[in-house]
C-alpha cells in the first residue's frame, strides 16, 4: 500500500490516515506535497514487544521533496499509531492495523 504524506490540497495529513495491511505487506510512505515530513511510530501505541526505533524514521530524518519515500514492513499483528514529528501538533497522525 502507498500512503501519501500530505493531501493533494497541501493539508497536513496521511492519506489514507487509517488503513489495514496483511502481516508482512510493505507500506510505502510517499511525500506528496514537498513539505518536510517523516514517519515515527508511537512506542506506546504499537503491539507489545515491537521496537519502535526499528520501524520508525529518526525524528531528525525528513523526506524533504515530493516523491521521496520511506518503506516499512510490519510483521506483528495489531494496531500501530504513527505520526509526522514536525507536524504531530497539527494533527498529522495515522493508524495502521496489521491483520
Swiss-Prot record:
GO molecular-function terms, A-Z: copper ion binding; electron transfer activity
InterPro entries tied to this protein: BlueCu_1, BlueCu_1_BS, Copper_blue_Plastocyanin, Cupredoxin, Plastocyanin
Location of the Plastocyanin-like domain: 1-99
Xref: SUPFAM superfamilies: Cupredoxins
Keyword Electron transport belongs to the record: yes
Topology relative to the membrane: Peripheral membrane protein
Keywords: Chloroplast, Copper, Electron transport, Membrane, Metal-binding, Plastid, Thylakoid, Transport
Signal sequence range: none
Record's GO cellular component terms: chloroplast thylakoid membrane
Record's subcellular location: Plastid, Chloroplast thylakoid membrane
Cofactor(s) listed in the protein's UniProt record: Cu(2+)
Residue numbers binding Cu cation: 37, 84, 87, 92
Note from the entry: The sequence shown is that of plastocyanin B'.
Cited NCBIfam families: cyanin_plasto
Family according to the record: Belongs to the plastocyanin family.
PANTHER family: PLASTOCYANIN MAJOR ISOFORM, CHLOROPLASTIC-RELATED
Cited function: Participates in electron transfer between P700 and the cytochrome b6-f complex in photosystem I.
Name of the protein: Plastocyanin B'/B''
Organism classification: Eukaryota, Viridiplantae, Streptophyta, Embryophyta, Tracheophyta
Amino acid at each position: 500500500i502507498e500512503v501519501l504524506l500530505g493531501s493533494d490540497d497541501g493539508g497536513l495529513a496521511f492519506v489514507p490516515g487509517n488503513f489495514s495491511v496483511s502481516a508482512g505487506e510493505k507500506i510505502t510512505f510517499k511525500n506528496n506535497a514537498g513539505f518536510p515530513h517523516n514517519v515515527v511510530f508511537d512506542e506506546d501505541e504499537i503491539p507489545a514487544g515491537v521496537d519502535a526505533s526499528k520501524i520508525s524514521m529518526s525524528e531528525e530524518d525528513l523526506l524533504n521533496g515530493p516523491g521521496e519515500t520511506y518503506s516499512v514492513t510490519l510483521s506483528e499483528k495489531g494496531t500501530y499509531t504513527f505520526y509526522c514529528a514536525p507536524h504531530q501538533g497539527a494533527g498529522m497522525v495515522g493508524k495502521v492495523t496489521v491483520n
